[in-house]
Regions:
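Transmembrane beta-strands of outer-membrane beta-barrel pores
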Residues: 33-39, 104, 118-124, 153-155
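Solvent-exposed loop segments that connect transmembrane elements
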Residues: 1-7, 40-90, 125-141
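C-terminal beta-signal and adjacent terminal beta-strands/loops
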Residues: 108-109, 115-134
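Residues on the lipid-exposed face of transmembrane beta-strands in outer-membrane beta-barrel proteins
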Residues: 15-21, 98-102, 116-118, 149-153
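Transmembrane beta-strands of outer-membrane beta-barrel proteins
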Residues: 29-31, 96, 112-116, 147-149
């Protein structure tokens, strides 16, 4: 949203690629990579009180001071408490995946396959310094390593 209240589209882009190998009739190996990106769409203005105000998406003046803090649990509660300020506007998301499927039975009663997959996921945010020009902006980064296994039965 612009300072005058009108909507401002967020430009972005993305890509996805896949590479597959079939070294033999019983084995399929695959590699996938995907990325999405959102550009900064930020605006600054002075409000009626004379203060500088940042609006929009990905402003370098947003407060990200709490983005690198681990949430703490208050006494006896099961939900995480507020860990501070973190606008955390997403800059990009990337994921790489590698896996395989092995067909270990194929017959008149159907097909049985098993597979393994590993995925590496990264989310980066736009940096923000809480409208403090002398401060270095904080940009949060989240990383997730994932492993899956699966068994499939295909009806004939």
């Amino acid at each position: 949203v612009r300072p005058d209240g009108t909507l401002a589209p967020i430009r972005g882009g993305g890509a996805l690629g896949t590479f597959e190998l079939h070294p033999n009739p019983k084995l399929d190996v695959y590699f996938n990579y995907g990325v999405e990106y959102a550009y900064r769409t930020d605006f600054n203005f002075t409000n009626v009180a004379g203060a500088n105000v940042s609006v929009g998406y990905g402003s370098p003046f947003f407060n990200n001071s709490g983005c690198e803090l681990a949430p703490t649990l208050p006494g006896g509660a099961f939900a995480a408490s507020n860990n501070g300020a973190c606008s955390g506007n997403t800059r990009n998301i990337q994921e790489g995946t590698v896996g395989f499927w092995h067909k270990f039975y194929s017959g008149p009663k159907g097909n049985l396959r098993w597979g393994l997959q590993y995925s590496y996921f990264v989310k980066n945010s736009w940096s923000g310094n809480n409208n403090t020009p002398t401060a270095v902006g904080v940009n949060a980064k989240a990383v997730d390593n994932m492993f899956w296994t699966s068994f499939r039965y295909y009806i004939p």
